[in-house]
Regions:
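Short coil turns that delineate tetratricopeptide repeat
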Residues: 65, 97-99
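Residue-level signature for tetratricopeptide repeat
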Residues: 42-43, 47, 60, 77-78
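TPR-adjacent "capping" and linker segments in tetratricopeptide-repeat scaffold/adaptor proteins
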Residues: 2-11, 21-34, 93
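Structural register within alpha-helical repeat arrays
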Residues: 39-40, 74
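Structural signature of tandem alpha-helical TPR/SEL1-like repeats
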Residues: 48-54, 80-92
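Hydrophobic/aromatic side-chain positions at a characteristic register within alpha-helices
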Residues: 32, 45, 79-80, 96
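Canonical positions in the second alpha-helix
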Residues: 60, 94-95
């Protein structure tokens, strides 16, 4: 199992993160694979940069509104950053409805 520090310290991730950060002003013109944007959100979460984690999660939800992975991350953010159990339940219900 790769630890988070190693996962975020490789050339490919650094390139993806640099692309994301460089495009902050115009994200609509950029495309990211769901795994890449999820890694970006996880990276900011790992670094305790909640504001940027929220932005990355919102961007992921914009690109992939029905992705279970994105909905899980939204639920985690709602629960652990917002302390909003009702919002977390809402995302969990959306995931459940897909299955």
């Amino acid at each position: 199992m790769v630890n988070k520090e190693d996962r975020f310290n490789n050339k490919r991730f650094k390139e993806v993160l640099a692309k994301y950060e460089a495009g902050q002003g115009n994200l609509d013109s950029l495309f990211f694979d769901v795994d890449d944007i999820m890694d970006i959100a996880e990276y900011y979460n790992y670094k305790a940069d909640v504001d940027n984690a929220r932005k990355a999660v919102a961007f992921a939800a914009h690109l992939y509104p029905t992705s279970p992975m994105v909905l899980i991350l939204q639920a985690r953010m709602a629960l652990f950053s917002d302390f909003d159990i009702d919002k977390a339940r809402h995302y969990a219900q959306l995931i459940e409805q897909q299955g």
